[in-house]
């Protein structure tokens, strides 16, 4: 197999013919390598950034990195430290498509983080649908039918279970004006 030093040499060889190096790793063909392509919650955020940093050391063209990223501060640090020129977000934008806007506005606490749980990837592969465990309206965030309407009568709501579904139910009930106990 090829190693990082091989890819650094390859990057130097093809640099004159590319505009951007998009650095990722792993494989869909072998399960032990798939976890690097789409890092789960069991791996560090940005676990593949070191690869982009290594390629960036040997080329002058822009380098992008990807892999379990979603924390705006970490993304800024990757760019500021020179590890990459571009940070790519995938699943983090499925969880919260407004992440860049919220980060730019300094509203980090309002960002819904990706759990890296693979619901999105699993559903896409199994039946071609878009689903997310923390974004129940994935792909329809701007549709008016999903705006929270005020209740006709304020109620006390008890939500049993603090997992993603329970927390989303509690948030929705609270936004509608109900008194919520989670």
Question: What name fits each language-model region?
Answer:
Residues 1-160, 164-180:
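Flavin-dependent oxidoreductase catalytic cores
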């Amino acid at each position: 197999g090829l190693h990082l030093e091989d890819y650094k040499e390859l990057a130097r060889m093809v640099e004159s013919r590319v505009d951007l190096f998009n650095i990722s790793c792993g494989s869909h063909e072998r399960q032990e390598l798939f976890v690097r392509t789409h890092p789960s919650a069991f791996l560090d955020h940005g676990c593949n950034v070191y690869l982009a940093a290594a390629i960036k050391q040997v080329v002058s063209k822009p380098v992008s990195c990807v892999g379990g990223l979603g924390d705006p501060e970490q993304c800024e640090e990757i760019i500021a430290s020179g590890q990459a020129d571009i940070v790519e977000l995938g699943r983090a934008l499925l969880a919260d498509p407004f992440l860049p806007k919220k980060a730019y506005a300094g509203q980090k606490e309002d960002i819904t983080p990706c759990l890296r749980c693979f619901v999105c990837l699993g559903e896409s592969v199994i039946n071609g649908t878009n689903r997310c465990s923390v974004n129940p309206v994935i792909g329809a965030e701007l549709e008016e039918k999903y705006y929270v309407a005020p209740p006709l009568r304020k109620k006390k709501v008890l939500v049993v279970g603090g997992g993603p579904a329970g927390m989303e139910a509690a948030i929705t009930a609270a936004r509608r004006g109900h008194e919520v106990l989670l």
